[in-house]
Amino acid sequence: MKVSAVRGLLAAAVAIAVGVAFVMVPRAPKVNKPERRTAERVFVMGFDGMDPTLTSKFMAEGKLPNLQKLANAGTYRTLGTTQPSESPVAWASFATGVNPGKHNIYDFLVRDLDTYMPDLAMVDKKSHPLKLLWGTIPIAKPVPLSTRGGTSFWVTAGLDGVRSKVLTVPVTFPPEEVEHGELLGGLPLPDLRGTVGTFYYWSTDLSSFEEGSPEFGGYLKRLLFDGGVSKTYLRGPESPILKQEEAALRAKQKSSALSEKEQARLTELKDIKDVNVPITINWTENSGKVDLEVQGTRLSLKQGEWSGWVPLTFNVNFLIKLHGMTQFFVQRADSELQIYAHPANMDPRDPPIAISKPDRFAQDLVKKIGVYRTIGWAESMDKSLQELRTDEASFLYDADKAFDDREKIIFENLKDDNWDLFVAAIETTDRVSHMFFRLIDPKHPMYDKDLASKYGDAIEKVYRRADALVGKIQEKLPKNTTFMVMSDHGFHTFRRGVNLNTWLVQHGYMVFDGQESPKKGLDDLVGRGQFWEGVDWTRTRAYAVGLGQIYFNLKGRESRGIVSPGAEYDALQKEIGDALAKELDPDDKAQIFRAVYKRDDIYKGEYLSNAPDLQVGFNDGYRVGWQDTMGGVQRTFVENNNRKWSGDHCATATEISGGVFFSSRKVANASPHIMDLAPTILELLGVPLQKDYDGKPLR
């Protein structure tokens, strides 16, 4: 076997080790167009979640002078967004210029039509089993699968000879080849565990019951010291080899009883299949500092201090090694020791799978600016703040550092003059808004007057930093550049969680085993430990998964479908939609939903069959409840959101959830839509437009 082939197969194993299948992103057919310089250049700066109401307020107060200047000289509008107003959906429409029915991204989550179980969208993790030689060496690649349809406008531009740079734009992982261009992947680029961000937390004051994975993701580990020394570890990816062995034993278990030896091995695999990095901690109580050793790297950190990026090597076996990196933060080192670590980012110096195109683009960037965060959601402390393991101050410090990383990447690439199209995105505006909306909304259940006095300006500060970046970019742009600033959606307070599955149970659309009527107490139906446990699919007509999506248990689509296509489907759509639209908040009789949309009214295209049958549109203040997003059933239909994640936009009615659009050019269109940007940019660059765009060029 050739060396290049072996390397390719090892890469396949690595991809499975981090939980990502090789994915073929749709591409337009190649044509032989040489590189060319366009008469016009276009620079697009995206700020995830920048809200038009807050932007207008801050501009009126004189706090965003650069955006105000851009608005005065050119155009400022609210930018219409997608159904639903979620980042992956909207950014996919931004890239392709089409509605979700043509690009196939409808939510952060998708459901398995056989098992009904939810999984992350955007990257399809399914693949054929990894074939191994001698149980060690991979000898066959997983099958490439596609998740997103449509063609990114930068791909179309590249095929016409346009030179481009695309930097950390959401829904650009796996990275796609761009002719005459360079692309650095963004969301959903995972950590080395294959998740969007598993944080680590070690503490002496954790109980044994708290150890493990909490509700919002992460890994908590109790520290026990002997003579001032504690031996622990940083949890890594699952070994693809041991994972396959476990899968084989489980498959055998379904058809026949396992031997005593096989059962013992299956039990053992649960504890040993993760590939971990050992950590030694030396600490004296009340010393105010701690010493760590991580694979030869020695750290001495004081309370409140961050480490630099620490390299990590996960040894899957003698052939497969995964290279990552993390940062440690000592939250306490007094009477208790509390240590946080970032998710294990792929090391851009030697990423286990491609995170950029060309592949070396990511590595070459390190030589110019040093190491940088690679995970798609660069602001990694939202989950630990949700779990009350870290505080607001450390979150904001880290968010600022994440912004630094993205900004350095932008300006390093601006040093080159070899581009006609430049597209970059920063998501810090979104992450800060999610976590701090409670401190600008006195009616929020988690509003805290003292915290508001300290951090009530957190959202304003990140908007002002975005404005400063806009000004610095403008100073460096060539004169013939159209400059656009945009966001994918706006923001709202999230005071109340709405449990759609609870409503479906209460009204008889979802039924559990042994449930005689929908009015039977829900106490018996919750807390069973697994999603859909006990659901009677022979009597269930509808179920909710994700952030506002309702699916019917449809014959010929779901594995145990009972709803017939045609008249029965149409009647059920109207029945549930009309009933939900009338629902009022039991606390204050406020209207919960602004609208409930039927599938065929909002989507069209070749992926229509994958769309939800109903999509809800919430009024301000409401969002799907936390457990409901993954198919859980709670005791009450509406409940307070008692979480620090207090601002949101997911499934808020599109009519009130638009983003922002600024342009250095005058635009006559009073109601631009995010789907309009792809054809607008291509027209400015002189690239022929495809026929299937849903958006129209803005003029």
Q: PLM features: residue spans?
A:
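Hydrophobic alpha-helical membrane-insertion segments, chiefly the h-region
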Residues: 14-25
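Secreted, luminal/periplasmic, and some membrane-associated catalytic domains
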Residues: 36-40, 47, 62, 72, ...
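Second-shell loop/turn segments in exported
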Residues: 53-57, 80, 141-143, 667-668
